[in-house]
Amino acid sequence: MGIGVKYKLISGMSVCPDHSIGETTMFPDAYFQTLRSYPNLENVLGDGIYASRWITDLVSKTQLTPYFLPKSNVTFQSKGFSGWYDMLYSLWENPQKWLEQYHMRSISETVNSMIKCRFGATLRRKLESRKATETKLKNVAHDIRRIGYIEILNDIKPKWPRKECS
């Protein structure tokens, strides 16, 4: 799930009810949805699970800086993925600045908590497609609530895309 740190809006999501599929395999889909939603993205933040060479390279190829906390036993060997070296070098060069940026990712945990508190635990559905639909609807409902708050508190009028009726 991609989440903006300023307004806590969900910018991209990839939902798979099959728990045998890991989060990292769903990263590209959510990431490219986020890029379409936020073309002026500056950084990409994530848990240590995303600190793999191919993911850091994917992010770097889109001219963005990845901030994924690497494990303690990693090396600078890029093994063909230049984004890996760039991320580790930026951490080595200025650890305080890097960690300051990285810890903005806690906002995504806040959003997960907000959704759970507002909408409760997942329903006990047997059909996998309904589980995915439930998750997507909760995320959309979260964004609608957040946009309502943004309109009121920040006096911002969002531009809703409108389709012509035929």
Where are these regions (language model features)?
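Basic, amphipathic alpha-helical segments enriched in Lys/Arg and hydrophobic/aromatic residues
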Residues: 96-166
